[in-house]
Curated annotation (Swiss-Prot):
It is found in: Cytoplasm. Its EC number is 6.1.1.21. One of its GO terms (biological process) is mitochondrial translation. CDD domains: HisRS-like_core (cd00773), HisRS_anticodon (cd00859). This is Histidine--tRNA ligase, cytoplasmic. Homodimer. The keyword Glycoprotein does not apply. It catalyses: tRNA(His) + L-histidine + ATP = L-histidyl-tRNA(His) + AMP + diphosphate + H(+). One of its GO terms (molecular function) is protein homodimerization activity. It comes from the Eukaryota. Keywords: Aminoacyl-tRNA synthetase, ATP-binding, Cytoplasm, Ligase, Nucleotide-binding, Protein biosynthesis. GO terms for cellular component: cytoplasm; cytosol; mitochondrion.
Length: 519
């Protein structure tokens, strides 16, 4: 019965897609076309699993759940973003490493708290229990411990895997890239931490995604706050994971989880509620250092003192306008030991998306993309892998690249600007027939000189077709060969945008192309 129902729904969706879209949008004003497509895809997938109209299993050619393909335009956008990020990392003196895409399961176990359930385990093929890497931080710590490295400034860009419930319209996937920057070593307090925040500020500013905020807190402040509010020691991590949901859920829902699901007393939850509503800057840190309750925790006082120092360095880095001290920031990963931070877009210049937990239409106030960068200090992680427990202090940041890609793609779709998918500088074209050999000789000269060039794979292509290809692909120059040009020892160089043409001697052609394309 279910199979018949799903098949009927899918056939309606497939046969009347436009009408269905229109009905859905009119009936649910908060729903986007992308979300409708996502739901339709799920129904079609279910229909295929249950069987087609004849009851037989049908194979659906598709990507795995939570993954996607990228077309040339999307890859051009991604490459631009990657180049911006790598350029920033290198500007700050980082070197790069790489680690295996899968690790021993034991390497990853116990490092992520409640998020450990999202780790992908692999079937045992050779006596080792393996898991796909969940992030790039734990493999980095393992790398430091294995190689006995005590200081390094490194960046790493690679794919990670999470068995999460994907929301692909909001840039959440099961396979995605992370771009990490970390500083390992024993240094004076808060200097490396401040540089990590400076890097986040630089990258988000250069990508021009719109306005953003960087929230900072400290795990020692959180633990001290939990202690003075009456949270039992053995509940610190689980309550921290619940507080971490405040960026997605209202306080009442978070409190309900603390009290009714995790067994925290209502009094303790109410006291936590007072603190997690606080935001500010250095002034808030100074105020909390005078708070009678907070002063009872030496941990919290140490964290607050470091927050003050951090803000003094951030002032020198000229980034305090975007940074806010937010006591609700928790970051649920177990390995953080000190400063933590997270960057969110405040949506200026970003297309509205429907709220995740409401049936209301999106508004400027409720629009959110989620975190686009996050990180913190993890001084104990390397010691977990060292046989003698030797610690290497570390601090780092991870850029949430997939969400940034989603925003950049939205902006590109809304823009009239043409996206180039190749870097070809010049097209080698022929004005008459039977000039293939001459075109091949010329393009070989250009390639040997390091010029990016291409030609049409026809013996006698029409000149108009060659010029149209240049306009469609954004190729700026055309080197045109004809019988007269060959006789005179010149090449006609055409500017595709202005359509101006000039004869250039064969000997000067390479220098002229390089001069015109050097900007």
């Amino acid at each position: 019965m279910l199979a018949m129902h799903c098949a009927r729904v899918c056939s309606v969706l497939m046969g009347c897609r436009t009408t269905t879209r229109a009905l859905s949008i009119r009936s649910f004003p908060g729903v986007t076309l992308a979300q409708i497509d996502e739901e339709v895809a799920k129904l079609l997938e279910l229909k295929a699993h249950l069987g087609g109209d004849d009851g037989k299993h049908q194979f659906v050619l598709k990507t795995a759940k939570g993954t996607r393909d990228y077309n040339p335009k999307q890859m051009a956008i991604r490459e631009k973003v990657f180049n911006t990020i790598v350029s920033c990392f290198k500007r700050h003196g980082a070197e790069t490493i790489d680690t295996p895409v899968f690790e021993l399961k034991e390497t990853l176990t116990g490092k992520y708290g409640e998020d450990s359930k999202l780790i992908y385990d692999l079937k045992d093929q050779g006596g080792e229990l393996l898991s796909l890497r969940y992030d790039l931080t734990v493999p980095f710590a393992r790398y430091l411990a294995m190689n006995k490295i005590t200081n390094i400034k490194r960046y790493h860009i690679a794919k990670v895997y999470r068995r999460d419930n994907p929301a692909m319209t909001r840039g959440r996937y099961r396979e995605f890239y992370q771009c990490d920057f970390d500083i390992a070593g024993q240094y004076d307090a808060m200097i490396p931490d401040a540089e990590c925040l400076k890097i986040v500020h630089e990258i988000l500013s250069e990508l021009d995604l719109g306005d953003f905020r960087i929230k900072v807190n400290d795990r020692r402040i959180l633990d001290g706050m939990f202690a003075v509010c009456g949270v039992p020691d053995n509940m610190f991590r689980t309550i921290c994971s619940t507080v971490d949901k405040l960026d997605k859920l209202p306080w009442e829902a978070v409190k309900n989880e603390m009290v009714n699901e995790k067994g925290l007393s209502e009094e303790a939850a109410d006291q936590i509620g007072v603190y997690v509503g606080m935001q500010g800057g250095m002034d808030l840190a100074e105020r909390l250092l005078q708070d009678q309750k907070m002063c009872q925790s030496t941990q919290a006082c140490a964290g607050l003192t470091d927050i003050k120092l951090l803000f003094s360095y951030l002032q020198l880095f000229q980034v305090t306008d975007k940074v806010v001290f937010d006591l609700s920031l928790a970051r649920g990963l177990d390995y953080y030991t000190g400063i933590i931070y997270e960057a969110i877009l405040t949506q200026a210049g970003v297309a509205p998306v429907a709220p995740e937990t409401s049936n209301e239409a999106p508004t400027e106030e409720c629009v959110t993309v989620g975190s686009v960068a996050g990180g913190g200090r993890y001084d104990g992680l390397v010691g977990m892998f060292d046989p003698k427990g030797r610690k290497v202090p570390c601090v780092g940041v991870s850029i949430g690249i997939e969400r940034i890609f989603s925003i950049m793609e939205q902006k590109a779709e809304a823009s009239t600007e043409k996206i180039r998918t190749t870097e070809v500088q010049v097209m080698v074209a022929a004005a008459q027939k039977n000039l293939l050999e001459e075109r091949l000789r010329l393009i070989t000269e250009l390639w040997n000189a390091g010029i990016k060039a291409e030609l049409m794979y026809k013996k006698s292509p029409k000149l108009l077709s060659q010029l149209q290809h240049c306009e469609e692909s954004g190729i700026p120059l055309v080197a045109i060969l004809g019988e007269q040009e060959l006789k005179n020892g010149v090449v006609k160089l055409r500017n595709v945008a202005t359509r101006d043409e000039v004869d250039i001697s064969r000997a000067d052609l390479i220098a002229e192309i390089k001069k015109r394309t050097s900007a």
